[in-house]
Amino acid sequence: TFVAIKPDGVQRGLCGEVMKFIQPMKQHYLDLKDMPFYAGLCKYMSSGPVFAMVWEGEGIVKMMLGETNPADSKPGSIRGDFCINIGRNIIHGSDTVENAKMEVALWFKPEEFVTYTEKAKAWVYE
């Protein structure tokens, strides 16, 4: 696909900002670079805006997202309710705590987070 940053983007000095969007996506999926679907995945993930978030909760995030393959996801999960194809499963979730730390660091700066103490946590988790 031919991509051009239009004159208004160039004049506004946004070329670097546009490239900042594309580079993290390739780095995010770097562990899959030897897979046959890597190029298509990078193209798909760079084809439009993404809404990046950080969620937390002991064991709940994976349950809310559902399985990578929507066909294996339970009703009531995001993928179980809204997806039918593994290649277009609408949402990404880190598969391990270690990967989550790397992915969060790739997409967010430390100053973008709010530090808070969740008072109910002591009453929910042991």
Curated annotation (Swiss-Prot):
Protein's cellular compartments: Cytoplasm; Nucleus; Cell projection, Lamellipodium; Cell projection, Ruffle
Listed SUPFAM superfamilies: Nucleoside diphosphate kinase, NDK
Domain of life of the native organism: Eukaryota
Gene Ontology molecular-function annotations: ATP binding; metal ion binding; nucleoside diphosphate kinase activity
PANTHER family: NUCLEOSIDE DIPHOSPHATE KINASE (PTHR11349)
Pfam families assigned: NDK
Protein's job: Major role in the synthesis of nucleoside triphosphates other than ATP.
Annotated active site: 92 (pros-phosphohistidine intermediate)
Protein name: Nucleoside diphosphate kinase B
Keywords tagged on the record: ATP-binding, Cell cycle, Cell projection, Cytoplasm, Kinase, Magnesium, Metal-binding, Nucleotide metabolism, Nucleotide-binding, Nucleus, Phosphoprotein, Transferase
